[in-house]
């Protein structure tokens, strides 16, 4: 679906929230499923959301922002199911970024495992989600500018730092 810039601006005003930017673009939201691995190296499916500025992107290149959600225990309180749960990725898309919000293992579609709380190996699922996002946008005629921003809060802050470390140690040539 699409979330309008007007809705986003009204949401901020109605809740007296100042995020330091004003949403410009409507945002298209897509839920995706991608392959990753669990703590034993076993293949698993995971889910997440992709947020795209709703504009003519044929001659543009976008930075990618990967936002890791805070502590969550309810499987359905994730961006792939409820797009407002990927608040940060949604709002950066409204100002011209590609937003990526992974649900993480044990949440969203991956109901066959328990959500691992604050474990560094979860960074592999984030890297796989970034790859899936890059593949998805490429297959839909959208280009990234090879800039990657990773952030998170609460549990997501730890996951963001673990992802930075993993990319630096293992995937620096790719990202």
Task: For every predicted segment, state its role.
Residues 1-57:
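Catalytic-loop region of hydrolases
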Residues 39-47, 51-96, 103:
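Short, surface-exposed "cap/lid" segments of acyl-processing enzymes
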Residues 32-33, 64-67, 98-103, 147-151:
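Structural recognition of the beta-strand scaffold that forms the well-ordered cores
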Residues 29, 84-108, 123-132:
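Active-site machinery of serine-nucleophile hydrolases
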Residues 52-61, 131-151, 170-174:
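Gly/Ser-rich "nucleophile elbow"/oxyanion-hole loop immediately N-terminal to the catalytic nucleophile
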Residues 77-79, 110-113:
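Conserved catalytic-core motifs of eukaryotic protein kinase domains, centered on the activation segment
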Residues 116-139, 161-164:
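Alpha/beta-hydrolase active-site loop
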Residues 152-156, 160:
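Gly/Ala-rich beta-loop-alpha elbow adjacent to hydrolase catalytic centers
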């Amino acid at each position: 679906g699409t979330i309008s810039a007007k809705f986003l601006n009204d949401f901020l005003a109605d809740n007296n929230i100042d995020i330091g930017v004003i949403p410009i673009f409507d945002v298209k939201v897509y839920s995706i499923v991608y392959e990753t691995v669990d703590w034993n190296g076993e293949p698993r499916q995971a889910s997440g959301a992709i947020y795209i500025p709703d504009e003519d992107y044929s001659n543009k290149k976008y930075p990618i922002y990967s936002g890791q959600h805070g502590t969550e225990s309810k499987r359905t309180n994730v961006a792939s199911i409820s797009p407002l749960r990927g608040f940060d990725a949604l709002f950066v898309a409204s100002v011209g970024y590609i937003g990526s919000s992974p649900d993480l293992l044990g949440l969203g579609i991956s109901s066959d495992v328990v959500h691992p709380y604050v474990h560094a190996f979860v960074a592999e699922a984030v890297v796989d989600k970034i790859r899936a996002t890059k593949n998805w946008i490429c297959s839909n005629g959208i280009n990234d500018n090879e800039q990657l921003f990773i952030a998170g809060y609460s549990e997501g802050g730890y996951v963001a730092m673990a992802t930075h470390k993993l990319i630096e140690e293992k995937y620096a040539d790719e990202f």
